[in-house]
């Protein structure tokens, strides 16, 4: 089993976010979403645009099957509002470029996070690093 580690400094989090933002808004938002919510990637990828309209968000965690409700982080909510402008409410938030309306895969999310972190000098990462 590979060991993954957290990103240990705020500066590195900002650097990785900026790196992703320059490349792709969806990928930058995926990173921010993981950092601010602490959710598992399988739960993050289930979000649709309509799930971002309210002050709160609720999910049934895939692994634990527990129903939970959370407040949006103000910074994340601001970025979400910019990102979802003119998007279809039924569209996946982290939509794949392949297919009509599919979320990106867990594998793709892993590749996005790992590549960005490695390019910014952070190693031993995975999607769980965001938690």
Locate the predicted segments by residue:
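Basic, Lys/Arg- and aromatic-enriched nucleic-acid-binding interface segment
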Residues: 2, 6-37, 41
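Helix-turn-helix-type domain boundary/helix-start signal
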Residues: 3-6, 70, 102
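Active-site/catalytic core of tyrosine-dependent DNA strand-transfer enzymes
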Residues: 10-13, 73-122
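Short, basic (Lys/Arg/His-rich) helix/loop patches that form interaction surfaces
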Residues: 18-23, 27, 89, 111-131
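Conserved tyrosine-mediated DNA breakage-rejoining catalytic core shared by Y-recombinases
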Residues: 37, 46-78
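Short, histidine-centered active-site or binding-site loop motifs used for metal coordination
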Residues: 63, 96-98, 131
């Amino acid at each position: 089993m590979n060991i993954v580690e957290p990103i240990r400094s705020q500066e590195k989090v900002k650097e990785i976010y900026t790196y992703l933002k320059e490349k792709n808004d969806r990928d930058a938002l995926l990173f921010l979403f993981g950092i601010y919510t602490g959710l598992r990637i399988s739960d993050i990828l289930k979000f649709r645009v309509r799930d971002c309209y309210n002050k709160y968000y609720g999910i049934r965690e895939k692994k634990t099957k527990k129903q939970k409700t959370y407040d949006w982080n103000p910074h994340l909510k601001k970025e979400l509002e910019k990102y979802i402008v003119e998007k279809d409410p039924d569209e996946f938030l982290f939509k794949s470029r392949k297919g009509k309306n599919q979320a990106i895969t867990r594998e793709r999310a892993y590749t996005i996070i790992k590549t960005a972190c490695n390019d910014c000098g952070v190693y031993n990462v995975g999607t769980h690093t965001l938690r």
